[in-house]
Amino acid sequence: MNFQRPNANDATISVNRSRSVVPQSGLCSRCVDGCVGNCEVFQATFRGRELIYPGPFGSITAGADKDYPVDYSHLNIQGYALGGEGLADGLEANPDTCIFPAVNVQTEYGWDVKVKMAAPVFTGALGSTEIARKNWDHFSVGAALSGVTLVCGENVCGIDPDLELDCNGKVKSAPDMDRRIATYERYHRGLGEILVQMNVEDTRLGVAEYVSRKHGLETIELKWGQGAKCIGGEIKVRSLERALELQKRGYVVTPDPSDPIIQAAFKSRAIKEFERHSRLGFIDEEGFLAECDRLRGLGFKRITLKTGAYALRELAMALKWGSKAKIDLLTIDGAPGGTGMSPWRMMEEWGVPSIYLHSAAVEFADKLAAQGERVPDLAFAGGFSSEDHLFKALALGSPYVKAVCLGRAMMIPGMVGKNVANWMNNGGLPKTVSQYGNTPEEIFVCWEQVADLVGKDEMKNIPLGAVGIFSFAQKLSIGLQQLMAGARRFSIPAITRRELMSLTKECAEVTGIPYVMDAYRDEALDIIES
């Protein structure tokens, strides 16, 4: 069985000429001399390194489509005909109390100082990619109104054209970071938070010091990695001057914009863009614990950690060291991941897939707990988009997982809402939207709820993408309530691993979740044999 065929994908705007394709190579079974394309090898003939990345940069997000032997679709959710766990104090389970709107989907995370969220979901890291920058108002206001945490990703200060550094090379003024934080905080309603992520370059630039000193942020996130790639973050730059500026700030920029040969190729328009890369991080226990102490010394109340689809060794380090450092939330992001810009073939072929990585995380967390060590609050990430995914991740990771990180899925409603506004302004709503109406009040089912939160007069300042994210978050919450009610679990802490069953023996082996014909079999036989 072939799990992923290379050499042609919509992400790289490429396609095979032939309908007959060699599964492993992705080459047409009959490659014709004279073919006009348009597979990846054809395009790489004259565009070379540009074919490494999905595109066009700044207009898309991309998600790898490798079909793994086991994934979350191999789990199904149990339903019961009696019971009601996790009801509010004093309530007895009966048909009048056990209704799905009564399900409490609020959650919280943190070692000592907790953060409450309206739903067990938060955004992926929205950093220096163009898709994050230009849609920030939609994403941030939407997350704030929805009562969930927003992660401001890496390199935001480092790529700011208006960045000012002091005499020590540290951030003195970062207007784009200021804008991002202010936008979220303006509509923050006491649930969720904004936290800023740091990588190697951010640490060197003193980003933590800046956001603590100027904005008084309570949480900072250390980034070890992500599911989409095992190298540092990337963006594309389309001017020589900008490439040289970022190189001067300490970033790795390729091809080298200071090379006269590269400059000549850029001026002749053979080279049309440059890539800005972040450095690989290096971790060790002593350094990690010391950095956590340093950040707390700056005034941060919470420190979170994001790790990617690395080998199980690194997963164990994140859990063990995170426990020692009293990390407030550990986000574990499995392959294949989604991105604003990552190497496409790396996305497809590297890393431990989500369900394998998450299953190992639970195994290791159980061992830590059995040793008497406290497990940090966990969040799972990697390929989630719907309410059933939330339930499955929370159940698989019970009792450690408190929330699920949604990357691309949380961005899409922001972009769609923005585009609805653009279409209305241009008088060209597509039928997929106009079937519901021609004004925001008609189109957005949650318009009045958002207006109730911020006030009618303030709605003129609310971007439609934010209303879109609020609507999507509502769909997730209500859908999760229904699934939880069917499983007779009326609060997030009440969800257990028993609420899942494996549809295949291989899934049962990977996850430790019983095969469908074994789940609850003992209880069933006790009834039959009674």
Spans of model-derived segments:
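Conserved, well-structured core domains of diverse proteins
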Residues: 1-119, 131-144, 149, 161-192, ...
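Hydrophobic faces of well-ordered beta-strands that scaffold small-molecule active sites
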Residues: 119-124, 148-154, 192-198, 218-224, ...
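Conserved, mostly hydrophobic/aromatic
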Residues: 123, 143, 330, 393, ...
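Active-site beta-loop-alpha junctions enriched in small/polar residues
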Residues: 126-128, 155-157, 197-203, 225-227, ...
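Phosphate/diphosphate-binding loops
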Residues: 189-213, 359, 363, 433-436
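Active-site beta->alpha loop and helix N-cap motifs at the rims of alpha/beta catalytic domains
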Residues: 193-203, 224-228, 271, 278-285
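Gly/Ser/Thr/Ala-enriched C-terminal appendages of enzymes
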Residues: 370-371, 385-521, 525-530
